[in-house]
Amino acid sequence: MSRVCELTGKGVQTGNNVSHANNKTKRRFLPNLCQVTLISDALGQRFRLRVSAAALRSVEHRGGLDAFLLKSGENELSMRARLLRRQIAKKTAEAA
């Protein structure tokens, strides 16, 4: 299981621990990933995704999973999220 957010693509970054004496040692900055269940209003289903805490805040800010996926670009989404985005777009186009 990779340490990458399924919605934003946020992943592991590298950097240095810097001591008081300015000694530098390599370290990794891990994203704050959570297993969450998000509900799609258009599809009427629940989806379990591994997302970062920042992405979860963005989903709530944009008004839910459907709105977040439709507003986001496909290049930053995981394959599973891209499939969801296409299904939601198709369902909303049928309803309109």
From Swiss-Prot:
GO terms for cellular component: cytosolic large ribosomal subunit. Disulfide bonds: none annotated. It comes from the Bacteria. It holds the Pfam family Ribosomal_L28. GO terms for biological process: translation. Keywords: Ribonucleoprotein, Ribosomal protein. GO terms for molecular function: structural constituent of ribosome. Belongs to the bacterial ribosomal protein bL28 family. NCBIfam families: L28. This is Large ribosomal subunit protein bL28. It comes from Agrobacterium fabrum (strain C58 / ATCC 33970).
